[in-house]
Amino acid sequence: MSEPAGKTLTEDQVLLIAKALGERRRYEIVKRLGERPDALTCCAVRDCTGINPATLSHHMKELEIAGLVEVVREGKFASYVLRRDVLEAFFQRLREDLA
């Protein structure tokens, strides 16, 4: 769900993000990514959350599908960056819908 900055999210996109954030471990991952301005490696996310590798892989895929994280690949290594633009668009849409 890569959307340009400033683009309004559809209702389906908002629901997908809400579903992703509604799971405790995914919410924890987003919080950890939000603490950093740069990318976190998969190992660093695992270390700071304590989530086992298979479960972490599943949650990272769900966050990627929701558009909340971007995967940065360097060779065989993957790092993750929080898509702050998507998160802000989500908040903006909630403000509009709930006003």
What residue ranges belong to the model's regions?
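N-terminal helix-turn-helix DNA-binding core of bacterial DNA-binding proteins
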Residues: 12, 16-55, 74, 78-85
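Amphipathic alpha-helical dimerization/coiled-coil segments
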Residues: 1-14, 31-36, 83-99
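Glycine-centered, phosphate/nucleic-acid-interacting loop/turn motifs that mediate DNA/RNA or nucleotide
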Residues: 67
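Short, hydrophobic-biased segments on the C-terminal half of alpha helices
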Residues: 60-61
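Short beta-strand "wing" residues that participate in macromolecule-binding interfaces
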Residues: 71
